[in-house]
């Protein structure tokens, strides 16, 4: 709670930026996304507005991306919210000025989507998947993640 309190206090100040549109993405689109980011270290963040640990983690990820962007890190957010909650998800990422690519999962079959991302992943949120410059998944972080451990893992592949 201590880590998220400053962000909660600043929410009214942050809510004035432009709305970040969430592009739809399915399992085939995710693979194309990974392929298009080859040459960069990318952290894919799967989250949802109803997931309390996700909401706490998102502003920390935005700060981490700001810190490591010059070294080549890009954070891509993918909301697992239902389509009818797209506006709420867009508003949430707007509050934290998430300026990287942002998507909304739109798969006809959640199990197929989850399996395409990582066959070992249960679909639990939050979920972070770290890819190296060759487009290979090198680490997975499922559930609440220690930001120091995450940063250390990212620095190893930058």
Locate predicted features.
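Sec-dependent N-terminal signal peptides
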Residues: 4-14
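A short beta-strand-turn-helix
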Residues: 21-42, 65
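Active-site acidic short loop of glycosyltransferases
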Residues: 38-40, 70, 98
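Short pre-active-site segment immediately N-terminal to redox-active cysteine/selenocysteine motifs
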Residues: 40-42, 46-50, 82, 124
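Conserved redox-active cysteine motifs that mediate thiol-disulfide chemistry
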Residues: 46-63
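Thiol-based oxidoreductase modules, predominantly thioredoxin-like and allied folds used
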Residues: 72-86, 98-108
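Short, internal strand/loop/helix patches
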Residues: 92-125
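Thiol-/selenol-based redox modules, centered on thioredoxin-like
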Residues: 124-158
